[in-house]
């Protein structure tokens, strides 16, 4: 796990922010949010979120304690100030005493705390960020952490790796319930530098943007090192000869995927073929069905990744037979997907 912090870049972001009327806190929050979001080992498909607690003027010009948190729909790798809506912090902290609230009421409450009523919706995990006392908080769905946090004995493994430096929280649906569970766990161990949320991801925090970011990179790196130490062997790639070429397979696949719209028009798809040594190595595994069967590594990725893929094979000769089998496989996939 490479630490991409640069003092030079940090100063540049501060200077840009000053010209745009942004505080140093917000400028550095933008900078580290972006370098987190640009690393696919940490964040995929717009997942994760970040926050900073700071002081900003409200509509009347009065200095107000706020939390700027990633807004829904914003990609961390392209975040701008508008993607970090500011909310009054004190009204959010008052919710620590309210044990239950559904998502609709919670979002209405959060919108009522926005400094700018026209701002985007704040993250569903805003209250988790608000309930914790730390100035800068980072949250990612790091691949290496999830590879461990999804194991049957995940907490035991995590304690072996991290000792007492991190807290460990069982999976809870993001939103109001998770915010309260995380708050209670932190309250029992306020010395920790972050949290592993089982089947979900990792939080780190700090008094500065760099401290929170450094901790994220360090703890994800420790997970990577642990996995490397346990790796027995790579998947073996089985060379195959005589398969139908991509040029012959693609039209058959497009035909099978085509469908009729409600207004009677034919809907066809443009295919995007992707391959690499890593992809071919993975697809050559004898355990491919098992490896692709358990769904995404965290429920937070299901919106973009979807729960499972359709696996099919290409025959070496008769594509007409494969086309019939593909149609059967697609029908079964659609029924499973819609169940």
Please provide the spans of the model-predicted regions.
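Glycine-rich flexible loops
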Residues: 1-339
């Amino acid at each position: 796990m490479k630490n991409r912090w640069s003092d030079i870049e940090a100063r540049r972001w501060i200077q840009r922010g000053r010209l745009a009327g942004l505080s140093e806190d917000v400028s550095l929050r933008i900078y580290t949010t972006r370098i987190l979001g640009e690393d696919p080992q940490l964040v995929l498909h717009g997942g994760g979120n970040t926050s900073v607690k700071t002081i900003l003027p409200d509509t009347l010009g009065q200095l107000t304690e706020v939390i700027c948190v990633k807004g829904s729909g914003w990609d961390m790798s392209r975040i701008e100030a508008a993607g970090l809506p500011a909310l009054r912090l004190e009204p959010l902290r008052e919710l620590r005493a309210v044990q239950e609230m559904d998502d609709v009421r919670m979002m209405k409450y959060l919108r009522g705390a926005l400094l700018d009523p026209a701002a985007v919706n704040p993250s569903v995990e805003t209250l988790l960020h608000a309930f914790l006392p730390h100035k800068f908080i980072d949250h990612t769905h790091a691949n290496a952490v999830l590879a461990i946090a999804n194991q049957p004995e995940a907490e035991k493994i995590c304690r072996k790796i991290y000792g007492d430096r991190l807290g460990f929280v069982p999976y809870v649906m993001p939103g109001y319930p998770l915010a309260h569970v995380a708050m209670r766990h932190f309250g029992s161990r306020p010395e920790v530098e972050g949290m592993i949320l089982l089947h979900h991801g990792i939080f780190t925090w700090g008094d500065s943007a760099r401290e929170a970011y450094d901790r994220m990179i360090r703890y994800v790196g420790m997970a990577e090192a642990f996995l490397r130490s346990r790796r027995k062997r790579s998947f073996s790639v089985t060379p195959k000869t005589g398969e139908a070429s991509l040029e012959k397979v693609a039209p058959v696949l497009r035909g099978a995927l085509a469908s009729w719209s409600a207004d009677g028009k034919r809907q066809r798809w443009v295919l995007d073929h992707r391959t690499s040594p890593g992809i071919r190595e993975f697809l050559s595994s004898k355990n491919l069905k098992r490896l692709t069967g358990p769904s995404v590594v965290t429920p937070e990725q299901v919106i973009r990744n979807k729960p499972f893929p359709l696996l099919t094979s290409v025959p070496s000769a008769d594509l007409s037979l494969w086309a019939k089998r593909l149609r059967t496989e697609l029908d079964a996939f659609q029924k499973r997907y819609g169940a």
